[in-house]
Amino acid sequence: MKLEDYFYIEGRYQLKNGVYNVFGSVYLIKKVEKLPCKFGKVSNSFYCWNNNLETLEGCPDFVGNFFDCHDNKLTSLKGCPTYIGNDFICDQNLQSTKEYRQYLIFK
């Protein structure tokens, strides 16, 4: 897998132990149902909106700024970052907002 075939990286990245850490922002540019790799830390924003994602597995654990996964085919927030420094945008996905509300309360 070539990272640049799936993502536009604004900044630089490092691959360590199969996990990509990005010093900048990440934009998913290819339509996929699942991310083809695992991200650890993204210092700025992570954008995977308007896609076909059915899962957030592979998303970064840490996002320093915005995390935008709106308009996908998600049914769960499993795999969602544990830290998001700014807005978490996830509308037009979940059938039920119960899990989303629980996540916001937890945050």
Which positions does each model-derived feature cover?
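Leucine-rich solenoid repeat scaffolds
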Residues: 69, 75-107
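GD-rich hexapeptide-repeat beta-solenoids
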Residues: 6-7, 97
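LRR N-terminal entry segment and analogous cap-like coil->beta motifs
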Residues: 4-5, 13-54, 58, 62-65, ...
